[in-house]
Every structure is written in C-alpha cells, then in structure tokens.
C-alpha cells in the first residue's frame, strides 16, 4: 500500500534507490527538498511483509517512479490518474503496466568511459547565457519569460549548493558555446541532461567535450552516470561518447491521459 513518506524513511529510500537513474532523481529530491514541502511529495509502497517495493516522488507535479517486484501496479496507476501528475517518468516495464494510454519510450545509457579534453571547459559559467542556450536548443522544455528563468536558476543553485547538481560549459570569448548539467545526483548515481551546443558551433566537438568532462568527473567520484535519450540521433551521439544501452524508460504527460 502506498503511504506518504516521512523523514524517518530517508535512509531506506536511499538504499532502495541505489544504482538506478530513477532512484537518483528520487534520492536527490528527497535530500534536497525533504518531505514536508508543498511542492515536493514522496510516497512509499510496501508489500504485505512491510518490504519497500515502490517509491513515488512528485516535484511540482512531475513524478518519478521506481518500482520493483511485488509492487501494486494497479495502485500506482490509480495514483497517477487521481493526482493528475503533469508528467511521469519510470522504467519501461512499469510504464507498460501503469500507463493506460500512449507514452514515449526512451533509451537509457550508462557511461563506460571515454577520454576527451578541452581547455575551455568551465564549471561556473554565466547562468543566464546557459539558459539562453538551452532555450534555443530545447524550446519545448524551457520558457523565455523571466519568471521561468528565475525558477530554473533557483532550483539549480539550490541543488548545486548541496552538491546535488553541477554544470560544465565551453566558453570562448565570453560566449557559452555548449553546456551540460546533471538533473539529478545521489550518493552513487547521476543523470546528465540538457546537453546543448550553439547551432553555429556544432560538429566541432563542443557538445561532446562538456558531456565527457561532466561524465568523467562523476565517474572519478565513483558514481554511475546515466543519460536518458530523447531520440535515435541523440542515442548515436551518446554511443559515440562512451555510453552503452542499459534499458528503457517510459515517459508520459498529462495530455496523454495517463
């Protein structure tokens, strides 16, 4: 049965979420935002033997689910619908059992290792310029208004100050040419997202440079590094950058009628 989690569940949740990209999101949110905030919620699902079998994390209505054998898929499906989640991300097997309508199938990659060096890599770029780059590359995910930028910035800085997020960028002559950041970090895992490169500078290795700078730094810290690929062309980019397929994710948004 799914029940609202409390701070006393944190260590059990972190252990349950180890070595898993969805678990990285859940652990990162739990550590960063806790259990008592209005926009961040966590639920734990337990078996009849009181064993933890599923965790649901919702941040601003965007949910991530990690479920294992013995979870109640019908209860998860009902919860997704009842709480009108804006979006839901989970593993492919759970998605096929819990999403009643269509969803996107995404490829998951894990970093095996690949060397690539570029001197112009920075860890403290001008964030407004980074946001502008992300906006130009991912207009469906980023908004041009000031409030959206400030909300994104405050969330990233909040997590970065707690060592739950980081960024790498190529900056030449004061201009951000490419950037990549982690959307989630836990004690043993990290998920890299938003690898962006200025359209005029593509095919020069700048996107690969920030991706590998970030991935190698995380790997050196003993973390498993994951990316979740949006499409086939991006998947090829990851394959050429030292990442190997390790599974599939399922993603849906509210308009798909979960």
Task: Describe the function of each predicted region.
Residues 1-25, 108, 112-151:
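Short amphipathic alpha-helix that is part of the acyltransferase structural core
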Residues 1-5, 15, 21-24, 28-81, ...:
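Conserved donor-binding loop and adjoining core beta-sheet/short helix segment
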Residues 32, 58-59, 141-196:
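A conserved beta-strand-loop-helix scaffold within acyl/acetyltransferase catalytic domains
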Residues 71-79, 194-197, 203-217, 240:
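Conserved acetyl-CoA-binding loop-helix of GNAT-fold acetyltransferases
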Residues 84-92, 211, 218-230:
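Conserved GNAT acetyl-CoA-binding A-motif
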Residues 56-120, 251-254:
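Acyl-donor-binding surface of acyltransferase catalytic domains
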Residues 93-103, 208, 231-248, 255:
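Conserved active-site alpha-helix within GNAT-family acetyltransferase domains
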Residues 42-47, 167-171, 226:
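Cytosolic beta-strand hydrophobic patch enriched in CBS
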């Amino acid at each position: 049965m799914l029940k609202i989690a409390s701070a006393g569940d944190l260590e059990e949740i972190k252990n349950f979420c180890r070595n898993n990209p969805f678990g990285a999101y859940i652990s990162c949110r739990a550590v960063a935002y806790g259990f008592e905030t209005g926009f961040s919620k966590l639920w734990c699902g337990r078996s009849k033997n009181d064993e933890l079998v599923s965790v649901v994390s919702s941040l601003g209505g965007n949910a991530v689910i990690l479920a294992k054998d013995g979870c109640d898929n019908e209860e998860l499906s009902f919860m997704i619908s009842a709480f009108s989640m804006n979006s839901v991300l989970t593993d492919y097997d759970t998605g096929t059992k819990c999403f009643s309508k269509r969803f996107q199938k995404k490829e998951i990659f894990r970093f095996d290792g690949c060397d690539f060096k570029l001197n112009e890599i920075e860890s403290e770029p001008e964030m407004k310029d980074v946001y502008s780059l992300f906006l130009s590359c991912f207009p469906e995910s980023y908004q041009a208004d000031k409030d959206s930028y400030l909300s994104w910035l405050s969330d990233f800085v909040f997590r970065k100050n707690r060592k739950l997020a980081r960024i790498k960028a190529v900056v030449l002559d004061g201009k951000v040419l490419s950037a990549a950041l982690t959307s989630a970090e836990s004690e043993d895992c990290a998920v890299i997202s938003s690898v962006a490169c200025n359209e005029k500078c593509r095919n020069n290795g700048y996107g690969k440079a920030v991706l590998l700078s970030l991935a190698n730094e995380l790997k050196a810290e003993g973390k498993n590094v994951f990316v979740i690929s949006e499409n086939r062309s991006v998947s090829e980019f990851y394959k050429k950058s030292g990442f190997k397929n390790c599974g599939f994710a399922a993603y849906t948004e509210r308009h798909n009628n979960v």
